[in-house]
Amino acid sequence: PSRRMWLVVPLLAVWSNLHGAALLGLGVTLAYLVVQRARREPWIALAVAVLSAAALCATPAGLRTVAYYHGVLTNAAAQRGVGEWGALSLGSPLDIVLVLTAAVLLFGAWRARPRLWEAVVLIVLALLTVTADRDGVWLVMFAVAPAARRLAPARSLRTLTPIAAVLAVILLAVCVVRGPVLSQASPSMVTRALALAHGTPVLADGSIDEQVAVAGGRIWAGDPIDAFPHRVQEVYLDWLAGDADGSRALTGDVRVVLVTRGTRTQSLMARMPGFVAAGQADGVIMYERGGSL
């Protein structure tokens, strides 16, 4: 057995400082240690397991990181199974692509006769993906390694490896520079919204909440939703769904609302007494309490 498994400890520490999915990384590590490594080197496996778990807390929050992960797993969106926590849907083109990709890789992994611990991880990730499609990317990434063991590329194809690597780097650079394609409000609308809000929190949907935050404004709730109290999470999800209970988000000091046109949220705001449309641009409508126009 390789001693390189100790590298998982610093890797998990770095990962935990970047994204909450490090918890899945810990799960994969524990599966390997318990199912395979513990039979040969139980004490080493135990040491790596303990240090790996501790590595998740190697963040500025320290032991409070445990509360963060608890909040991630128990947030209102996860409990309701909505948004990125929603189940796979054949009505979603991206989910269909995910299912087809995962099916091909899982078939390849099965033919390669994965190790027992790999099979355990694949099964668990597959079940997680069915209940929450956000986990699908980790299923696909993990399945690549065992599936690739069945591949025996021709010598002539190996010369394409450097070309493929260069193209991948170029594509990655383009994606980083371009950024994600999101439904966004115009900068002028965000500026006006902050001016009308006068320091009060802005209620916004989609990626618009992130724009408001980046511009220095306050938001009533947004992504990541687990950063807000559970009661606020539930009301915000009701509001996003266009549910009448979501109107509770407007009973406080919210004066300005930004929504994407044509959504259920916009339909709710259109019939909300006390709020009037104060402008629209690029598919985003701004509502103001009382109105200034």
Language-model regions, residue ranges each:
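Short hydrophobic alpha-helices at membrane interfaces in multi-pass membrane enzymes
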Residues: 1-13, 42-47, 116-123
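Hydrophobic/aromatic-rich transmembrane helices and adjacent perimembrane loops
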Residues: 128-155
